[in-house]
């Protein structure tokens, strides 16, 4: 960036061990600062003066922007500065010397802030001296590391006494002296907490504002910005000027402002103010005083030269504070003073960095060249104006033009002309996704990569990838020549670039050459490989370790390792290392099925990327760490991620079911085809280039004894698996697995059905069924000591704690990978011989069952009418006209609105679910099929988990069921129809989207349309949620990327801040956490578990973690106590100590390794599952009385924005033990908000069209309201007739008058009548405010529509608005927020204008407008305060001029009011306005609690652990459901504290994290974060490890508050400027870094990637030292 530089780049030297020409210098740190005028001149090779680019012949014009001193423009030209051609010339800078100094555009906001707080008379800060001293002391203390003392200094507010001032000064002096004496400050490591506190001190100080100076008492003129980058003084009041004159203060305007802008003498422009002797001032002539008054009665420009002198004196007088600007950490580097705020020359970048774009015959100049040209033109015009001595106003006008030109050059968004706004300034080159940081430094184009479509291959190993020859010929690896590989490399050179395996290039110390095309020349090169010194044939003994540095770039070949990636790369397993298999004749990448779930890939045209590592360190990490076999467990929860799918599952069930027998040939063929004999070898075996691996192993295969010996030997399918397991675990103890299968116990009972299919003896049939349940025992897999005893291998055996998972846990990732590879080939070959097919007969239902199905679905058609009759209280036997029913529906919708519609929908759906899932429907797919499940192929696929689910089977054979759209039934049009073919308000299930048809027999057009609507919703969700979840994950990643496990087992940030003392509170790695609490599995496989652990591990893996966690220890003890004695003796665990030793060994083997990037894993583990969430932002809690925000919007609230005012705040609290549901109802009634609408029984309106009232012809509207009697009110409220009567007269009538007047104004505007309304009325100010905010929202069209009122939009408009917002890229969603200041942000923009400080309130702090209430917010019981408040309202009731009521009467349950309207007034719907008003006026209001319902402790949002919270005992679900609880919408803790005699307030909980933080503290807020994120994921059936959530919550509450994961939160507090810049608003953060003189020590991954260095995590967190023996 122009005029920003990095200085003091620290370098360290080391010798590369890998390459002879390796890097010898590495950047260690980067410091940011602004370039001084001397720096610009030092870098410049040319003073650019001419705006002309080319002469008449087209050559570069001397002194122009294409001058050859700046570098050649064309390839054939030579540089006039270095003499090199374009390719070799690095480019040279020039500069434009400005006639007058101007403001630095990037620092203008900060400069303006300084000017507002500086006194123009005494040149000090206008703040009190003690405030300045306190700020300086605080900064010094924080930099020293004593944040506590700095906080105490802030809290000790100074008093007016002299002694306190002296003590404050002494504290300041002492601290300062201590600070100066501390010599280690420069070498300190600054933390994010220090940085946050320092910036907070500066921000708070710059917020201090005063009308007059606290030192000289002078009243300074107010400043304004007529345009960005220009300052103007406002006219002063006569009283202020007079006060200054009396005090002897005078603002002196220099007449030589333009003629001598750089003069520093007292007679020049710097003599803006001077404090003269008081006696002399009193003797001034009255004419001078009058001139002073006249001068300050008008505005005038404050020129940059004047401002520079103001700042010069300010820096001299307030040197101690100002020294922190430019060198925040007081590191003693070269300090930059006030001159950084001004530009005297502009640096011109070299020509090669702003090349013109050619398209055909036209040439388009680079935007920077255009901007620089404009600056030169403006500068020359200004210089000519000074030379010609034009008027001062004209010179100033041209000076402003120069300032504007430089502003546009730096940031085009400051331009006033739209055409200039669309161009790119320097800031635009840095910002956003296409900017310099993210496009060029964080993300770079890669070489040695390929991309193609993937296709499946079940024969290759699961960690192999098939590469087509066209890629293998192009991708090469630079292999160093050694005595061990020289023969292979010779062959490669001889083969050349066109024959595989060959080579393309050969290089030595001097050069790199492409291999010649002739074989003879290549043979000559091959013979020279080891022809000179250092060659020897004796293995391992050489004369010279460096054999001339020869390297051969050979082709990719079998056994090489490559990185394979499928985008989007949402989590760690999206990029894995695979071994190469070059497959001849192929054109696509070949991938095994087991990798599909890891990459989330399918084979319908997906493409994947392959990257070929180019050095040995990368290859070593790829083979041992990133290898696909090692990515077996899901990082988010530790569950298995790699498994066989679809046909392999079908084949495994068919092979391992009980009646599968194989002869010797078939048995041996299956074993041999599986390739299991080669799995024991550690090296690759097979012939190169073959699609099928040919066994080259001499290892013997141990077979098993056949299950049947006579008449012929027969083996079962289970014995094939036994033989495979024996081979896989060869050399290790055998293992045991017990795991339930997905197949039910009666799945294979087909024969019992076929014995007597028409038997009527139900008793006999039941006995047969029971015998099958006892004898089959195929519903549970049992492998004992490698012997497959019973059960089948289905989907469950590839899931958690299944067969493969157990092998992975006991024998390692390679064994599990080998097992999957063997199973894949085995099941593929078996299915080829066995066969598998599906037909229509698999789908057909038995005739009698089909008739019952049809009958039951016909009963469902009457559900709608039954629900309506129940709702309206109509007896079943009573006949009712359909038209009458429709009228009733419309009436209830008119009265209750959408809530009535939703309630009816829920009732119908509940009834339909009961009706369609009972009786024959339950057993239809198990007992009702023509082909029984054991022989039914569709059943086999769905039940075993191979393909599809029971729902798919049901849709094919039974019915499609209810179609849901956003969790609701099919929506209705305005006419009340769901489709034009149905009647209005047709509540039959079919009209609401219930489809009784099935795919087998076809769908009717209406059903087909409904089904398409439901399918479309899924597509829309997928398209929209991608950007939202993507931006959420990016926010998490950038905040958490630096967190890693250290060697002391703590989790620390890049600055050394401790986030957790033990990762996840127990130190266990999520990948290894699966079996740590599975005590039974550990005991039955104890031999293998103990074999993996050494004695050192048992004694403690680390001195920091030496014992088991308490919860794990207690769990193991309980397990031993529950074991019968015979099992204890059999498992050798008679005492607890033996089991604890086993668990301890497993625990220490499962600890997270130092260097583990746990922050990245946590970010990915939360971000990746969020893509599975739908966009249903509101899910119904309990019975649907309350909405709860879920999904991505809720995660954004919790993590990204840390919103103080969330969309759906709730509170929950259980009742005390012994309290009943009646007590809960009592509380809900007292907390319930009761509006006037709730007590209105009916409303009548009559109109007298023409009458005379007070000698005026008018119309009278008579509104009569009938109210319910008090006995109809809620049971436990104390509302009386007096209460509602006073409310109706005092509040309701006032609100109704205001609503009528507002409505009349709107109708007048619609009719085009602009009548002046006399006098403002109560409640109309908000309308004016709304109109203003509406205009602001129109101006800010890119703000996601946050300010738009929902009520003003129709449903279609709202939907369109949402769609417009959703289509935005998630990057745009982030960087253009409304609460951000202008695009060129100084250090602290929000406090830019002192005028705005008093009125500026953040969104979070703005109180929401409260509805009118007749009682205090916090009053929840009693009537006394209600009456007092209502009387107070009545006393305040003043009749406005515009009021229209002429008669009011309220007696008993009746209230009547008459309104007078002029004959020319438009007609209004008064009844509708009255109904809307009645819903806004409260008779009883319990503060912020909107609604309260009775729930139970089984609600996931309710916390309940029994009578004693400290015990945290486990409570059964039934016991929880029996305990009543409250569920309130809104957060008001004091309101519930009032009922602590009935509520167990120890369990009081809210989902509002800010409220929990403010009331209960930071630990409660941390727990709330964990609970809320967990609740969101559990609602979608997603499991995320609690360790990730613990880390996220600890990070967000690390500083003692609740900070968001956005650029305002954790990113803003990062000590790494590169980390901040590469996230968002790069310009803002780079200016901040340069202003403060920040130093980046390159600890964060972002900073290291920017400079091309490996991250300091994983294998990068340590260095290796070579032991050298001299």
Curated annotation (Swiss-Prot):
Residues annotated as binding Zn(2+) 1: 79, 82, 89, 92
Family annotation (CDD domains): RNAP_I_Rpa1_C (cd02735), RNAP_I_RPA1_N (cd01435)
Domain of life of the organism encoding this protein: Eukaryota
Cellular localisation: Nucleus
A Gene Ontology term for the protein's cellular component: mitochondrion
Region annotation Bridging helix: where it falls in the sequence: 1005-1017
UniProt EC number: 2.7.7.6
SUPFAM superfamilies named in the record: beta and beta-prime subunits of DNA dependent RNA-polymerase
Coiled-coil annotated spans: none
Top-rank EC class of the record's enzyme: transferase
The reaction(s) this protein catalyses: RNA(n) + a ribonucleoside 5'-triphosphate = RNA(n+1) + diphosphate
Protein family according to the UniProt entry: Belongs to the RNA polymerase beta' chain family.
Protein name per Swiss-Prot or TrEMBL: DNA-directed RNA polymerase I subunit 1
Native source species: Arabidopsis thaliana
Phylogenetic lineage: Eukaryota, Viridiplantae, Streptophyta, Embryophyta, Tracheophyta
Gene: NRPA1
């Amino acid at each position: 960036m122009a005029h920003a530089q990095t200085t003091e780049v620290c370098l360290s030297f080391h010798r590369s061990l890998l390459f002879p020409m390796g890097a010898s210098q590495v950047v260690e740190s980067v410091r940011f600062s602004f370039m001084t005028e001397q720096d610009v001149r030092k870098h410049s090779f040319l003073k650019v003066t001419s705006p002309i680019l080319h002469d008449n012949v087209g050559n570069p014009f001397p002194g122009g922007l294409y001058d050859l001193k700046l570098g050649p423009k064309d390839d054939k030209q030579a540089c006039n500065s270095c003499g090199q051609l374009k390719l070799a010339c690095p480019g040279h800078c020039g500069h434009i010397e400005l006639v007058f100094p101007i403001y630095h555009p990037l620092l203008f906001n900060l400069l303006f802030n300084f000017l507002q707080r500086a006194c123009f008379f005494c040149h000090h800060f206008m703040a009190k001296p003690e405030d300045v001293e306190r700020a300086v002391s605080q900064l010094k203390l924080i930099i020293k590391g004593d944040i506590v003392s700095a906080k105490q200094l802030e809290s000790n507010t100074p008093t007016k006494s002299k002694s306190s001032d002296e003590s404050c000064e002494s504290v300041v002096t002492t601290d300062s002296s201590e600070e100066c004496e501390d010599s280690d400050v420069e070498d300190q490591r600054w933390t994010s907490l220090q940085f946050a506190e320092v910036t907070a001190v500066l921000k708070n100080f710059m917020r201090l504002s005063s009308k007059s100076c606290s030192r000289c008492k002078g009243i300074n003129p107010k400043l304004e910005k007529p345009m960005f980058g220009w300052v103007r003084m406002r006219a002063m009041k006569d009283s202020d000027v007079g006060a200054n004159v009396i005090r002897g203060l005078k603002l002196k305007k220099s007449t030589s402002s333009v003629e001598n802008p750089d003069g520093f003498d007292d007679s020049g422009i710097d003599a803006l103010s001077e404090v003269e002797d008081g006696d002399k001032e009193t003797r001034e002539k009255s004419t001078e005083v009058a001139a002073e008054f006249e001068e300050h009665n008008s505005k005038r420009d404050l020129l940059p030269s004047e401002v520079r002198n103001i700042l010069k004196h300010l820096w001299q007088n307030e040197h101690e504070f100002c020294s922190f600007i430019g060198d925040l950490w007081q590191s003693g580097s070269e300090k930059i003073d006030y001159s950084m705020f001004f530009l005297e020359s502009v640096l011109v970048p070299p020509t090669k960095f702003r090349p013109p774009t050619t398209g055909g015959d036209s040439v388009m100049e680079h935007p920077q060249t255009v901007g620089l040209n404009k600056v030169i033109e403006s500068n020359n015009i200004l210089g000519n104006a000074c030379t010609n001595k034009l008027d001062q106003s004209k010179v100033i006008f041209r000076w402003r033009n120069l300032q504007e030109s430089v502003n546009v050059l730096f940031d085009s968004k400051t331009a006033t002309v739209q055409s200039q706004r669309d161009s790119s300034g320097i800031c635009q080159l840095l910002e956003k996704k296409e900017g310099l940081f993210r496009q060029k430094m964080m993300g770079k184009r890669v070489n040695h990569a390929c991309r193609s479509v993937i296709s499946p291959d079940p024969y290759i190993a699961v960690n192999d990838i098939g590469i087509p020859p066209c890629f293998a010929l192009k991708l090469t690896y630079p292999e160093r020549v050694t005595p061990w590989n020289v023969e292979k490399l010779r062959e490669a050179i001889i083969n050349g670039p066109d024959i595989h395996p060959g080579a393309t290039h050969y290089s030595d110390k001097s050069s790199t050459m492409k291999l010649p095309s002739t074989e003879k020349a290549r043979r000559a090169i091959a013979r020279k490989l080891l022809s000179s010194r250092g060659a020897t044939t004796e293995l391992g003994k050489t004369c010279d370790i460096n054999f001339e540095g020869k390297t051969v770039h050979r082709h990719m070949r079998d056994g090489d390792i490559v990185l394979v990636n499928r985008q989007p790369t949402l989590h760690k397993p999206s990029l894995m290392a695979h071994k190469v298999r070059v497959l001849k004749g192929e054109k696509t990448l070949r991938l095994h099925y087991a990798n599909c779930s890891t990459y989330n890939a399918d084979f319908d045209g997906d493409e994947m990327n392959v990257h070929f590592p180019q050095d040995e360190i990368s290859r070593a990490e790829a083979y041992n760490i990133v290898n696909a076999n090692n990515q077996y467990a899901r990082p988010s929860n530790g569950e298995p991620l790699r498994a066989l799918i679809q046909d392999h599952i079908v084949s495994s069930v068919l092979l391992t079911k009980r009646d599968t027998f194989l002869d010797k040939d078939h048995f041996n063929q299956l074993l041999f085809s599986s390739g299991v004999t080669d799995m024991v070898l550690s090296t690759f075996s097979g012939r190169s280039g073959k699609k099928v691996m040919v066994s080259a192993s001499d290892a013997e295969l141990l077979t098993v004894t056949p299950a049947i010996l006579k008449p012929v030997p027969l083996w079962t399918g289970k014995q094939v698996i036994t033989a495979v397991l024996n081979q896989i675990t060869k050399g290790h103890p055998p293992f045991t697995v017990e795991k339930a299968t997905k197949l039910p116990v009666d799945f294979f009972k087909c024969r019992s059905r076929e014995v007597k299919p028409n038997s009527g003896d139900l008793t006999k049939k039941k006995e047969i069924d029971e015998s099958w349940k006892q004898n089959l025992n195929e519903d549970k897999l049992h492998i004992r000591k490698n012997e497959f005893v019973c059960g089948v291998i289905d989907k469950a055996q590839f899931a958690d704690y299944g067969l493969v998972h157990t092998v992975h846990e006991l024998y390692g990732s390679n064994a599990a990978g080998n097992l999957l590879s063997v199973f894949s080939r085995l099941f593929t070959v078996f299915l080829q011989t066995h066969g598998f097919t599906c037909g229509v007969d698999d789908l057909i239902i038995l005739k009698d069952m089909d008739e019952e199905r049809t009958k039951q679905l016909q009963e469902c058609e009457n559900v709608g009418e039954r629900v309506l009759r129940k709702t309206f209280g109509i007896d079943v036997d009573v006949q009712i006209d359909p038209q009458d029913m429709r009228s009733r529906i419309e009436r209830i919708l008119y009265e209750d609105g959408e809530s009535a519609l939703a309630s009816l929908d829920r009732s119908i759906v509940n009834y339909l679910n009961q009706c369609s899932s009972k009786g024959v429907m339950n057993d239809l797919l198990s007992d009702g099929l023509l082909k029984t499940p054991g022989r039914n192929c569709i059943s086999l696929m769905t039940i075993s988990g191979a393909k599809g689910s029971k729902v798919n089977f049901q849709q094919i054979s039974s019915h499609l069921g209810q179609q849901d759209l956003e969790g609701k039934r099919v929506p209705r049009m305005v006419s009340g129809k769901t489709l034009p073919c149905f009647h209005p308000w047709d509540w039959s299930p079919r009209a609401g989207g219930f489809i009784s048809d099935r795919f087998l027999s076809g769908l009717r057009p209406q059903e087909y349309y409904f089904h398409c609507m439901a399918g479309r919703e899924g597509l829309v969700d997928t398209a929209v949620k991608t950007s939202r979840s993507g931006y959420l994950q990016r926010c998490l990643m950038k905040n958490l990327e630096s967190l890693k496990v250290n060697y002391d087992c703590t989790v620390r940030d890049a600055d050394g801040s401790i986030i957790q003392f033990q990762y996840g509170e127990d130190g266990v790695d999520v990948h290894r956490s699966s079996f740590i609490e599975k005590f039974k599995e550990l005991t039955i496989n104890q031999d293998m578990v103990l074999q993996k652990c050494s004695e050192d591990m048992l004694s403690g893996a680390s001195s920091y973690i030496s014992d088991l966690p308490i919860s794990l220890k207690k769990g193991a003890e309980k397990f031993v106590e529950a074991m019968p004695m015979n099992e204890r003796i059999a498992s050798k665990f008679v005492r607890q100590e033996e089991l604890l030793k086993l668990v301890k060994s497993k625990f220490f083997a499962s600890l997270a390794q130092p260097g583990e990037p746990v922050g990245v894993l946590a970010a990915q583990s939360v971000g990746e599952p969020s893509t599975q969430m739908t966009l249903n932002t509101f899910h119904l809690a309990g019975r649907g009385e309350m909405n709860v925000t879920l999904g991505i919007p809720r995660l954004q609230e919790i993590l990204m924005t840390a919103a103080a005012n969330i969309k759906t705040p709730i509170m929950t609290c259980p009742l005390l033990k012994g309290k009943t549901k009646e007590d809960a109802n009592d509380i809900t009634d007292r907390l319930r908000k009761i509006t006037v609408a709730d007590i209105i029984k009916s409303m009548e309106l009559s109109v007298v069209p023409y009458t005379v009232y007070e000698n005026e012809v008018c119309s009278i509207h008579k509104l009569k309201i009938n109210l319910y009697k008090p006995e109809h009110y809620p049971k436990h409220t104390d509302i009386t007739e007096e209460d509602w009567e006073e409310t109706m007269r005092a509040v309701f009538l006032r609100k109704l008058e205001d609503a009528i007047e507002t409505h009349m104004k709107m109708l007048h505007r619609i009719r085009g009548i602009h009548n002046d309304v006399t006098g403002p009325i109560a409640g109309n100010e908000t309308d004016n405010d709304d109109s203003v905010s509406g205009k602001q929202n129109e101006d800010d069209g890119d703000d996601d529509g946050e300010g738009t009122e929902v009520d003003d939009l129709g449903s279609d408009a709202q939907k369109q608005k949402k769609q417009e917002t959703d289509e935005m890229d998630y990057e745009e969603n982030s960087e253009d927020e409304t609460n951000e200041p202008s695009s060129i942000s100084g250090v602290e923009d929000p406090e830019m204008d002192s005028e705005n400080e008093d009125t500026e309130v953040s969104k979070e702090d703005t109180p929401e407008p409260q509805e009118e209430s007749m009682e205090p917010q916090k009053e929840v019981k009693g009537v006394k305060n209600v009456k007092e408040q209502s009387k107070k309202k009545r006393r305040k009731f003043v009749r406005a001029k515009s009021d229209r009521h002429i008669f009011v009467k309220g007696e008993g349950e009746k209230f009547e009011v008459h309104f007078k309207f002029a004959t020319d007034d438009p007609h209004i719907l008064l009844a509708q306005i009255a109904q809307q008003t009645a819903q806004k006026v409260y008779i009883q209001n319990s503060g912020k609690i909107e609604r309260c319902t009775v729930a139970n402790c089984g609600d996931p949002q309710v916390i309940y652990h029994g009578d004693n919270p400290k015990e945290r005992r486990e409570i059964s679900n039934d016991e929880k459901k029996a305990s009543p609880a409250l569920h309130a919408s809104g957060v008001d803790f004091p309101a519930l504290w009032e009922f602590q005699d009935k509520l167990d307030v120890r369990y009081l909980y809210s989902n509002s994290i800010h409220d929990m933080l403010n009331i209960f503290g930071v630990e409660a807020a941390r727990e709330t974060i964990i609970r809320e994120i967990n609740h969101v994921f559990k609602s979608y059936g997603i499991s995320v490890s609690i360790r990730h959530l613990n880390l996220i919550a600890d990070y967000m509450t690390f500083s003692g508050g609740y900070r968001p994961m956005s650029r305002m939160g954790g990113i803003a507090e990062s000590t790494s400027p590169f980390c901040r810049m590469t996230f968002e608003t790069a310009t803002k953060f780079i200016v901040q870094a340069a202003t403060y003189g920040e130093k980046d020590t390159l600890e964060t991954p972002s900073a290291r990637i920017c400079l091309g260095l490996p991250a300091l995590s994983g294998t990068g967190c340590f260095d290796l030292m070579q032991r050298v023996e001299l």
